[in-house]
């Protein structure tokens, strides 16, 4: 099964995309693994890419390189491909999914993401209607409504301001 890294360059405080890509290529060459790379360009792009990839090529091991939002998009995009596997390299602000594992895991290890054993994980399926259009999606660690959504929206806005990044955006 091919491993495909989906990289969100806007995750966390901004990912050094070229450096990450170089490291992924270096590790995959060492492991003699054929990998794919996709750098997202906008919100929703990770979901769209994973879905289209599955429709064209079938199952893959997708590695979401970003935060919880990127991971959620990849899970939603690959949701109709039952043999797809999902991994994560945490680059986001909170990385709540990864922090929920007591042992910490090898989430930051590119080699472990390529060679690791997969295990099943429960997901949350949600359905909503927005502007008259139905949407079904999936998330892996939490689903928020109300106040939490307002905080997340305000945090995203704060992170766009100069000198405000990471956890500081949540405090403000």
Residue ranges and their predicted role:
Residues 1-62, 72, 76, 108-111:
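ATP/NTP phosphate-donor binding region
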Residues 9, 65-67, 89-91:
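Glycine-rich beta-strand-to-loop/alpha-helix junction loops that act as flexible
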Residues 15-17, 69-72, 93-97, 149:
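Short, flexible micro-motifs
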Residues 38-39, 59, 63, 67, ...:
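Short secondary-structure transition/capping motifs
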Residues 40, 80-172:
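Catalytic core of DAGKc-family lipid kinases
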């Amino acid at each position: 099964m091919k491993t495909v890294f989906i990289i969100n360059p806007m995750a966390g405080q901004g990912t050094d995309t070229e450096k990450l890509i170089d490291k992924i290529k270096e590790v995959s060459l060492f492991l003699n693994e054929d990998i794919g790379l996709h750098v997202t360009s906008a919100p929703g792009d990770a979901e769209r890419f994973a879905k289209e990839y599955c429709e064209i090529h079938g199952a893959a091991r997708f590695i979401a390189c970003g935060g919880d939002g990127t991971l959620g998009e990849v899970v939603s995009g690959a949701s109709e491909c039952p043999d797809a596997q999902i991994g994560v390299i945490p680059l986001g602000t909170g990385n709540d999914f990864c922090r929920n594992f007591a042992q910490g895991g090898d989430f930051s290890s590119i080699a472990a993401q390529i060679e690791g054993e997969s295990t099943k994980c429960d997901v949350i399926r949600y359905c909503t209607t927005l502007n008259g259009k139905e949407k079904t999606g999936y998330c892996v660690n939490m689903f928020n409504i109300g106040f939490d959504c307002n905080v997340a929206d305000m945090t995203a806005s704060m992170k766009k301001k100069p000198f405000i990044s990471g956890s500081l955006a949540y405090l403000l």
